[in-house]
């Protein structure tokens, strides 16, 4: 009310008038202002590309081999652009991997701390892009604000900061495939252990990586209900999610 206030932005930790500061692609902590990680994952992926087993059967990473640089405004040819043409399963995994670096460096007992994260590109938007489409698809929602899988992954990872306050779980993707499909199933959860069930039969516990990612390899598709159950350190169920096979459209 008395003036002297300013909004924050990236690289403003040394500006006393800023209300917050942030970083792009770097891990940092602040002594004076709340410090938010902002652009820790620049990868891109279309919402309609589920995985390689789903229509339109987009091969993960397939697309352009050049893009226009936002810094030089020149086309960079013959570059590896796979990171900007993800399917949703690999896009979700990449977001988990990138955020884990920041979560691992979360606040301790010192006087320089990190205050969490924000998504600088929350929804797909008409800013500089690197994928085959002519707009940026780094968002956790598409341009119509329809959530992608990383939206739900962030709900899991961001429910609390120093420690998880409410255990959550999310099964990546859907459960509608051809009968001969055998594929990995990915689950994002803050639980200590995750067990997968298919039509009530246990498929065992997932391999845990990057704290939040659980992988179940070579799961053969069978129509019905796919359930993921998360357990706390005492072995008690703390969260549950399910996917149900949909019928064929009429």
Feature map (PLM): residue ranges:
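Edge beta-strands of extracellular beta-sandwich domains
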Residues: 235-247
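Short coil/turn motif common to extracellular beta-sandwich-like domains
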Residues: 179-186
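Short proline/glycine-enriched turn/loop motifs at strand-loop junctions of beta-rich domains
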Residues: 187-193
């Amino acid at each position: 009310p008395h003036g002297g206030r300013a909004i924050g932005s990236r690289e403003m930790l040394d500006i006393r008038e800023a209300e917050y500061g942030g970083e792009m692609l770097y891990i940092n902590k602040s002594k004076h202002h709340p410090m938010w990680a902002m652009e820790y994952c620049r990868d891109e992926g279309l919402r309609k590309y589920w995985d390689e087993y789903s229509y339109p059967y987009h091969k993960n990473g397939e697309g352009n081999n050049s893009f226009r640089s936002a810094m030089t405004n020149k086309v960079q040819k013959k570059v590896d652009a796979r990171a900007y043409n993800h399917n949703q399963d690999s896009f979700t995994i990449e977001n988990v991997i990138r955020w884990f670096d920041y979560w691992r460096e979360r606040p301790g007992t010192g006087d320089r701390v990190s205050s969490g994260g924000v998504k600088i590109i929350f929804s797909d938007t008409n800013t500089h892009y690197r994928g085959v489409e002519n707009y940026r698809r780094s968002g956790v929602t598409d341009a119509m604000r329809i959530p992608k899988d990383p939206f739900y992954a962030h709900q899991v990872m961001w429910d609390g900061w120093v420690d998880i306050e409410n255990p959550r779980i999310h099964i990546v993707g859907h459960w509608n495939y051809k009968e001969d499909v055998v594929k990995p199933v990915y689950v994002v959860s803050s639980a200590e252990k995750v067990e997968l069930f298919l039509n009530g039969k246990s498929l065992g516990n997932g391999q845990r990586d990057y704290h939040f990612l659980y992988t179940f390899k070579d799961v053969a598709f069978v129509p019905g209900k796919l359930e993921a159950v998360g357990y706390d350190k005492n072995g008690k169920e703390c969260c549950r999610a399910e996917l149900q096979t949909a019928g064929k459209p009429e």
